[in-house]
Amino acid sequence: DDDGRAYQFYSSEHNATMYISLLTDDYLKPSGRFTRNFIGESREAPAVFKQDGKYYMLSSGCTGWNPNVAEIAVADSIMGEWRTIGNPCTGPDADKTFYAQSTYVQPVAGKKNAYIAMFDRWKKTDLEDSRYVWLPIQIEGGVLTIPWRDKWNMDVFDK
């Protein structure tokens, strides 16, 4: 986090509950302080980022190799109460997260409020042929969306 603290996010209870665990100051082990989140919702692949003082988590459902809908949640603090907002993806195959799964959200260097959502597109029959999908996150009026784009460049962040 921007305060020097580190956290581990993991699913437990047969992948039904996501835990957020504060690590010790040396980042080597759990501190013993944790929260249970999305209880019974079976979420995985958390990609967490901070925007205007709020924490956002992009995540996927636990459906094995089968694609599913993404969800974004927001919290005022990383160990606080997370509120699910819904699917941020729009466009073709948005209900399947563009046949991909969240993996990371990359802040764009030199740009304020600019982020790239990174996804894994697993090919279960040939893992070596799996791909990545990178898409810009749009932020308008506090609403985050990830629209499908066949192609794009960094100019999208200048608008």
Explain the meaning of each model-derived region:
Residues D1-K159:
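Carbohydrate-active catalytic/glycan-binding domains of CAZyme proteins
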